[in-house]
């Protein structure tokens, strides 16, 4: 029997039910439920359907004039009645995605302490490092299957937001549910409060986190280790997603734990998966292969290098050598293009640095090769921005790229919108509508010479909900590189532009449930093939995906003994 139709037996009654967002139905409680659960007189007389409630909520939502107020309003509904919240979001997913997540969630993180209203998730501070097990036991969610955790040090492109970073795990898990059908009862946002180095927060009397500099070194490593072990003891099968950790910690934590626990880093691996999926779709639309492209990155941090490594892996799978693939990828950071003779390169950057002997013939060869120099010499067909610095894809750079590439692929992926390397409008006008553009944040369609171009949002929300659903449906114990690659290929298979030769590079958000299920199947099948999940048939796997897919419908309640 469908869980959404099976009665739920509750051992409590009265106002407590109305204060529990996972089970509150508000005006939708039936006459029978109002009698049995002592709710008579606590609600208006009329019994409403969830659609009637959602219609009223949407009317109220439209009364707010700015995005932050809309975000706060939706969060209040989420903290009051989660089923209604997800029905409302699912009814207006394209309109509300930028409100519940990027770019609006960035403002919410900056104002987290000032706008704080109600608890959600867990805050685990370093001061309580010896009581992590007790804190996990205090969670209102008992059957946790997906955790998103941050330490708040690198929130979007906004830097250290301390515990204000909690807005990101809350928002990400909202997308796991609204896009991937993960029951909100199975999700838990967690913030590790290890202090902050943001002077504005340290001086802010309203700041609600630890007012001390961030811990680091062995103290930090041991604290995260204690957290991971405690989570594994409490919920041994939970999927853990690392979110918005600083570069110096993100890759080491991923390398340390990816083979120990079922975990992944969305900034590194999720971003890489959705970017590769988008590139595969663009290549398919252009009737070419990724291994034929020359790719330049602006931004050589953990996210950029993670994408680059995923691209190299895909190129190798298409038949070229790893050495050749790396010669076709050019990484540029604030000091110029990464070269093998540069000092102080991080380990994950060293593998992507160009050999100096291969580029000595370039014009303007020096120790500091600019992005424009790379475009003029390497003649890239793909340009990807993950720098967090706005406006760096200049008209000169885009036109130089277009001069040697008829249909340049340009992905300014930095979030939020204020940090984008160039707007789609500028890129398309500079290339007379010839560029294939995808962005990290949402943008309106662009009109060039009476032709309207839909702007694909190369957002991780296309990928991680499907990964989560695939892990849950298969019971996978790890998230492997092959599973992530499978998610990229599955996403590319859903591209309207690749399928029909027209439309957006990525599917419409209205189709996200179909996309997530398609990705979930590919991820789960790969997990089984690699031995990370128990064998099953395709038919049973499809059934498991549907069985795990939660929809925003009210269940009937029955009273049980206290």
Curated annotation (Swiss-Prot):
It comes from the Bacteria. NAD(+) binds at residues 154, 267, 415. PROSITE patterns: MALIC_ENZYMES. Divalent metal cations. Prefers magnesium or manganese. It catalyses: (S)-malate + NAD(+) = pyruvate + CO2 + NADH; oxaloacetate + H(+) = pyruvate + CO2. One of its GO terms (biological process) is malate metabolic process. A divalent metal cation binds at residues 243-244, 267. One of its GO terms (molecular function) is malate dehydrogenase (decarboxylating) (NAD+) activity. Keywords: Metal-binding, NAD, Oxidoreductase. The active site is at 101 (proton donor), 172 (proton acceptor). Its EC number is 1.1.1.38. Its cofactor is Mg(2+); Mn(2+). The record marks 267 as: Important for activity. One of its GO terms (cellular component) is cytosol. PANTHER family: MALIC ENZYME-RELATED, NAD-DEPENDENT MALIC ENZYME, MITOCHONDRIAL. Belongs to the malic enzymes family. Homotetramer. HAMAP family: NAD_malic_enz (MF_01619). This is NAD-dependent malic enzyme. It comes from Shewanella pealeana (strain ATCC 700345 / ANG-SQ1).
């Amino acid at each position: 029997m469908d869980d959404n139709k099976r009665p739920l037996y509750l051992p409590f009654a009265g106002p407590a039910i109305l204060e529990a967002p996972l089970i509150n139905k508000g005006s939708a409680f039936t006459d029978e439920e109002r009698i049995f659960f002592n709710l008579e007189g606590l609600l208006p007389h009329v019994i409403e359907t969830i659609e009637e409630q959602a219609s009223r909520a949407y009317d109220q939502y439209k009364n707010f004039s700015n995005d932050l107020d809309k975000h706060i309003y939706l969060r209040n509904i989420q903290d009051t009645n989660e089923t209604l919240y997800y029905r409302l979001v699912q009814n207006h997913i394209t309109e509300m995605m930028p409100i519940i997540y990027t770019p609006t969630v960035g403002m919410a993180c900056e104002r987290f302490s000032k706008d704080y209203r109600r608890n959600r998730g867990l805050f685990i501070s370093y001061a309580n490092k010896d009581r992590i097990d007790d804190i996990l036991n205090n969670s209102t969610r008992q059957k946790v299957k997906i955790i998103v955790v941050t330490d708040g040090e690198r929130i979007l492109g906004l830097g250290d937001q301390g515990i204000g970073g909690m807005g990101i795990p809350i928002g990400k898990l909202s997308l796991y549910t609204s896009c991937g059908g993960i029951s909100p009862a199975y999700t838990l946002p967690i913030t590790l409060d290890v202090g902050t180095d943001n002077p504005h927060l340290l001086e802010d009397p309203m700041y609600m986190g630890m007012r001390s500099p961030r811990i680091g070194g062995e103290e930090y490593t041991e604290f995260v280790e204690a957290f991971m072990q405690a989570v594994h003891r409490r919920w041994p099968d939970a999927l853990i997603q690392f979110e918005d950790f600083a570069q110096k910690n993100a890759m080491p934590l991923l390398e340390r734990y990816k083979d120990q626990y079922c975990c992944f880093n969305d900034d590194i691996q999720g971003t890489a998966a959705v970017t590769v999926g988008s590139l595969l779709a663009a290549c398919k639309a252009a009737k070419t292969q990724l291994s034929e492209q020359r790719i330049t990155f602006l931004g050589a941090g953990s996210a950029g290098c993670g994408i680059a490594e995923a691209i190299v892996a895909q190129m190798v799978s298409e038949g070229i050598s790893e050495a050749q693939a790396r010669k076709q990828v050019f990484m540029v950071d604030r000091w110029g293009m990464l070269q093998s003779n540069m000092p102080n390169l991080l380990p994950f950057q060293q593998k992507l640095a160009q050999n100096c002997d291969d580029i000595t013939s370039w014009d303007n060869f020096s120790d500091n090769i600019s992005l424009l120099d790379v475009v003029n010499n390497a003649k890239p067909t793909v340009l990807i921005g993950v720098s967090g610095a706005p406006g760096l894809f200049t008209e000169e750079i885009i036109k130089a790229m277009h001069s040697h590439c008829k249909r340049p692929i340009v992905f300014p992926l930095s979030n939020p919108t204020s940090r984008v390397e160039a707007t789609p409008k500028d890129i398309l006008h500079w290339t007379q509508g010839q560029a294939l553009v995808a962005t990290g944040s949402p943008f309106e369609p662009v009109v060039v010479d009476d032709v309207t171009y839909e702007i694909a949002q190369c957002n991780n929300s296309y990928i991680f909900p499907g990964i989560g659903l695939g892990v849950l449906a298969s019971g996978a114990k790890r998230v492997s590189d092959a599973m992530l690659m499978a998610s990229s290929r599955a996403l590319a298979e859903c591209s309207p532009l690749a399928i029909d030769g027209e439309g957006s590079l990525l599917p419409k958000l209205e189709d996200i449930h179909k996309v997530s299920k398609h990705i979930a199947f590919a991820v789960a099948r790969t997990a089984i093939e690699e031995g990370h999940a128990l064998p099953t048939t395709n038919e049973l796997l499809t059934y498991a995906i549907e069985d795990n897919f939660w929809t925003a419908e009210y269940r009937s309640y029955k009273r049980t003994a206290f």
